Each structure stands twice: as C-alpha cells, then as structure tokens.
Amino acid sequence: MSLKESFKALSDPTRQEILQMLTKGRMSAGDIGAHFDMTGATVSHHLNTLKQAGLVEDIREGKYIYYELNMSVIEEMMGWFLQLRK
C-alpha cells in the first residue's frame, strides 16, 4: 500500500463518510451498510478499496467481519502533510 493508493481511496465521499463513522470504533459491514442507500456489494467494494489502501483493517469474529481504522497508515499520511510545512 502506498500513500498514492491511500489518497486515491480518500477521494470518494462515501469512503470519507465510512472513515468518519469508524472514528467512533469498529463496526460490522452490515452496520456500515445500514447508513447508506446502496447495495451490499457496493458497500463491500468501498470497504475493500479502503482495506487495499491500508486505511481500514478487518477483524473476523465468528461469522462477522468488523472494520476499524488503521491508525498507522493515517498517522503516516498526517506525517506527510506535516513535512509540507517545513
């Protein structure tokens, strides 16, 4: 995963909203999908894009998959922005 992939994943408003939701803690794909008027496949696509970009991680518990923010990648992105101030 690269910063380029992470920034590209952030370009979509739905994915931005998903990340904002995850700031409150981990959520299941079903709980995330309940906030949007789109198919489960579309929500899965957005979650997969965020996962491939390293912005979220998935945790399997039994038959459920939960998603949470990957703070290490977010911190890396913030560090990149802070370097621009120098």
Protein language model regions, located:
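Conserved segment of winged-helix/HTH DNA-binding domains
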Residues: 2-3, 66-86
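Short helix-coil-helix linker/hinge
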Residues: 9-14, 71-72
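Short capping segments at the starts of secondary-structure elements
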Residues: 13, 25-28
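Pre-recognition alpha-helix immediately N-terminal to the DNA-recognition helix
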Residues: 16-18
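Base-recognition residues in the alpha-helical recognition helix of bacterial helix-turn-helix
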Residues: 20, 44-48, 63
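Helix-turn-helix DNA-binding motif, specifically the short coil turn and the N-cap/start of the second
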Residues: 28, 39-42
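A short acidic, leucine-rich amphipathic alpha-helix
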Residues: 32-33
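Beta-hairpin "wing" of winged helix-turn-helix
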Residues: 51-61, 68
